[in-house]
Amino acid sequence: MSEQKSSNQMWGGRFASGPDAIMEEINASIGFDRKLYAQDIQGSLAHAAMLAKTGIIAAEDHKQIENGLKTIRKEIEEGKFTFSRKLEDIHMNIEARLAELIGPAAGRLHTARSRNDQVAVDFRLWVKQELEKTAAALKNLIEAFLERAEEHAATVMPGFTHLQTAQPVTFGHHCMAYVEMFGRDLSRVRDAIERIDESPLGAAALAGTGFPIDRHMTAKALGFREPTRNSLDSVSDRDYALEFLSLAAICAGHLSRLAEEIVIWSTPQFNFVRLSDAFSTGSSIMPQKKNPDAAELVRAKTGRINGSLVALLTIMKGLPLAYSKDMQEDKEQVFDAAENLELAIAAMAGMVRDLTVNVAAMKKAAGSGYSTATDLADWLVRTLGLPFREAHHVTGRAVALAESRKVDLAKLSLEELQSINPAITAEVFGYLTVEKSVKSRQSFGGTAPQEVRRQIRYWKKRIAKA
């Protein structure tokens, strides 16, 4: 039989004995929710000020509470605070210490408040602040890509589909593709900040409170646009956490694709880019190795972010309104994802700025795999008036001939091309170089250097306002 213990002093009036040791272990969240100490104190300071302003507590009690909370914040920041698992969570740890510091006045702080709305406001504040940090990190990554895109607006390289050579593009154009991706990520972050900007403080356990509180006052004090409108939803909601994990997972997908390309491109077989020693490691047995570990670790860490999203979706999917203890498991998922996303974005921004681009290798590869075949087909349509499907067929025969002769399309003789279609003229050879190919792609959003530079100008203006 388990040893009987005294019940928790914060909620134990109903209980004759304390929790079993294993219950104490599974119930405690202080091991991870101590990360919310600053937000918890911030919320309590706002709540106490409101209670005093509305006459719910005396001014002297408010002053003691305020001073005590500031003392606790300093103790935590200086590493002098002792966290107790017996007190379950960050809220009770702080309240218990407040009682030690100021006595009975500490018991007035929780008037018109429940841990349900307390943790909801703490967590919202933390996620909101993390979203702002993510936005700043994404801006930095986008700026890194803009720098490289401007530098390589005319650097030709192969574009791929199915990882097979498709058409020539420029490295600048490829960089701008990632600007678009991370730009959408930044937009999602901004949208999430707009939706999270409501304060649940004052919703109490689930039904609101009979005390004459001022929720607009606390919302304003905490930097929220307004209070939430339904007390039941306020304490039941974790959409903001799921939305953070969702946008983090999408961003992680972009980071992982980029990491994969860096890994591939840095192989001797591609040799498109080279990472410096700052973002590489060696082998314990093979002295010649220089491994792109930073990119590989970004690729792996993004998988953890996906896992966090699935975990919280699964936790929340079957919960009745309002609060259930299951929701205690939300924080570790978000904390882990936020830490890994921040690290991955920062590492990738460093790698993008660090990359040495092998222009010669890119240009050589750009002309391989008959990458200008589409240019031949387009010339047949524009110049000879062939329907595109017929031009496609003629070009396919030309590729087959070049392949049998083991030469590029531009190395076929005019006579050989005319054996496929007699109307072909020598003019066509001017359209079969990779430089001509990329310059011709002047459609809006295309890979022509002048169009890439237009994209860069657009994003520089947009990111300056983001």
From Swiss-Prot:
One of its GO terms (molecular function) is argininosuccinate lyase activity. It holds the Pfam family Lyase_1. Pathway: Amino-acid biosynthesis; L-arginine biosynthesis; L-arginine from L-ornithine and carbamoyl phosphate: step 3/3. GO terms for cellular component: cytosol. Its EC number is 4.3.2.1. SUPFAM superfamilies: L-aspartase-like (SSF48557). It catalyses: 2-(N(omega)-L-arginino)succinate = fumarate + L-arginine. Keywords: Amino-acid biosynthesis, Arginine biosynthesis, Cytoplasm, Lyase. It is an enzyme of class 4 (lyase). The keyword Acyltransferase does not apply. It is found in: Cytoplasm. One of its GO terms (biological process) is L-arginine biosynthetic process. InterPro entries: Arg_succ_lyase_C, Argininosuccinate_lyase, Fumarase/histidase_N, Fumarate_lyase_CS, Fumarate_lyase_fam, Fumarate_lyase_N, L-Aspartase-like. PANTHER family: ARGININOSUCCINATE LYASE. Belongs to the lyase 1 family. Argininosuccinate lyase subfamily. This is Argininosuccinate lyase. It comes from Brucella abortus (strain 2308). The lineage of its organism: Bacteria, Pseudomonadati, Pseudomonadota, Alphaproteobacteria, Hyphomicrobiales.
